[in-house]
Amino acid sequence: MKKWMLWVLLIGLANVAFASQQWNDFSENVTPQNVHVFAKDLGGIIGSGTYTTGRILGWGGFQIGPRGSIVFKMSQGQGADEATRNHTALGDRDEVGAVFYPWLQADIGLPFRIDGFIRAGSYEGMTIAGGGLRWGITRPSETLGALQPMLVVAAHSASARDFSATHYNASLVLSMKFKYFVPYIGGGVDYTTLHINGADHYTEMEGTNDYATTARGTLGFNFKLPSYMDLSLAAHYAHYGLGGEASLTVRF
């Protein structure tokens, strides 16, 4: 177990060390035509991965591990021509390509069918920290085929060189227990306030806010592994289209 946690730490440090600071391209590329869709995309990225089943940990449970989300392509902005629409707040849509963000999350089981969680990450020039609560609508059941509904609420703060953001989301999750895996489906809403600190070509945008609300749906599978480990793989759909998320956690 100690070796596994050491490898996670080393991989995380390597990612930070060799990252390309992608989020620092914001001030060079943000425009009135792409800022709103960027706020929507950012909300979808931050809000993903807050759950991996519809089942709570239960009183005294604890879980920790790395998680990550990927957006395969950022949303198009507004504009009269294709080149303008493809110019995102991080650069040309095709050149930017997939956007990945990792973080470390810790969860703890509390009384009254409530779990609390905190998570944080710093990658490619953006730092995110936040947390939330999960509430099991029904009592946890070990019966195969049992449905487990859950409500999730979360809040985050994000900071980069040229922008900052606050983010709130709420989701409803439903999972079904099988012997070796747990499929889950969820839907939620992300609300993001984007504050612009720097805009090289549109200085009038500096100091202004953009407000964005977007829906997000998730479909995934959670697998119970040996040594109290869980592997979760999921696809989600938000304003930017298709994305993915994964986690590898250990339960105590």
Q: What function would you assign to each model-found segment?
A:
Residues 20-141:
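Transmembrane beta-barrel domains of Gram-negative outer membranes and organellar outer membranes
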Residues 20-30, 211-213, 224-252:
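Predominantly the C-terminal beta-signal and adjacent terminal strand-loop region
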Residues 53-60, 138-148, 179-181, 225-228:
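Short loop/turn motifs that connect adjacent beta-strands in outer-membrane beta-barrel proteins
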Residues 53-55, 66, 104-110, 131-135, ...:
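Residues on the lipid-exposed face of transmembrane beta-strands in outer-membrane beta-barrel proteins
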Residues 60-62, 100-104, 127-135, 149, ...:
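Hydrophobic, lipid-facing positions within transmembrane beta-strands of outer-membrane proteins
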Residues 95-101, 117-131, 158-166, 211, ...:
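Solvent-exposed loop/turn segments connecting transmembrane beta-strands
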Residues 106, 110-124, 146-157, 174, ...:
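Transmembrane beta-strand segments that form the barrel wall of outer-membrane beta-barrel proteins
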